[in-house]
Regions:
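Extracellular glycan-recognition surfaces and repeat-rich motifs
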Residues: 11-51
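Carbohydrate-binding surfaces in secreted/extracellular proteins
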Residues: 78, 145-176
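Beta-strand acidic-aromatic groove motif in beta-rich domains, primarily in extracellular
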Residues: 86-98, 157-161
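Glycan-recognition/cleft segments
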Residues: 92-124, 134
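Flexible glycan-contacting loops in extracellular carbohydrate-active proteins
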Residues: 174-202
Length: 203
């Protein structure tokens, strides 16, 4: 594998950098979460990353050596928990993972969509800066295994491939695109949220 990390040190030390203007990201222990009614314990180990939405800033950790070269294929996997009280007062689409090239330039992403009228949450994958179609509903209050395949294509030919899996089931496949450059960074967290997405949390 290229990169593997956990949060069992209770911080971001296994990642290259953190962005958290507004201080909405932390690394709670199972003891902290156990005191919250309805909260999950960490998916694995004693700590996890938590983001409490409420502003438009990025709240992320970054691995700067992802290094998916032209024509190469790489997989990623992370666990995701969306609290039952996660809610918004306006419809919102925001990224929870980005594949970035030097710049940084967002080449592909995994996005969540929340609909204000129902607070239903959907997940999707796309070439480019934000998912606009192909969403699949994802349940709140339980852990999900999120997996994705990325085949990088920089040269002419539009041979790029993205696949998204939720709990082992493929929910989306995107083909026929090019990246501007090879992938260098992987960014996990929340990016481009609206301030109206302001209730609940993600783990």
């Amino acid at each position: 594998y290229i990169f593997s990390a956990s949060f069992d040190s209770g911080d971001n030390s296994q990642w290259d950098s953190e962005q958290d203007t507004g201080t909405l990201l932390d690394f709670p222990s199972w003891r902290t979460l156990a005191a919250i009614p309805g909260a999950a314990t960490p998916y694995r180990g004693g700590y996890c990353m938590r983001i409490t939405p409420g502003d438009t800033n990025a709240h992320t950790v970054t691995e700067a050596d992802l290094n998916i070269a032209d024509t190469a294929t790489a997989w990623l996997r992370f666990a995701l928990f969306i609290s039952n009280n996660f809610a918004a007062t306006a419809d919102d689409i925001f990224n929870i993972y980005e594949w970035q090239s030097t710049g940084p330039v967002v080449e592909a992403c995994i996005s969540l969509q929340i609909t204000a009228a129902t607070d239903i949450v959907d997940i999707g994958i796309a070439d480019g800066t934000e998912v606009s179609s192909g969403f699949t509903q994802i349940s709140k209050g339980v852990w999900h295994q999120i997996e994705a395949l990325c085949t990088c294509d920089v040269a002419a030919g539009s041979d790029g491939i993205l696949e998204l899996y939720v709990d082992g089931i493929q929910v989306q496949r995107v083909t026929g695109f090019n990246f501007a450059a090879a992938i260098t960074d992987g960014v996990l967290g929340t990016l481009n949220t609206l301030s109206t997405t302001n209730a609940g949390y993600h783990l």
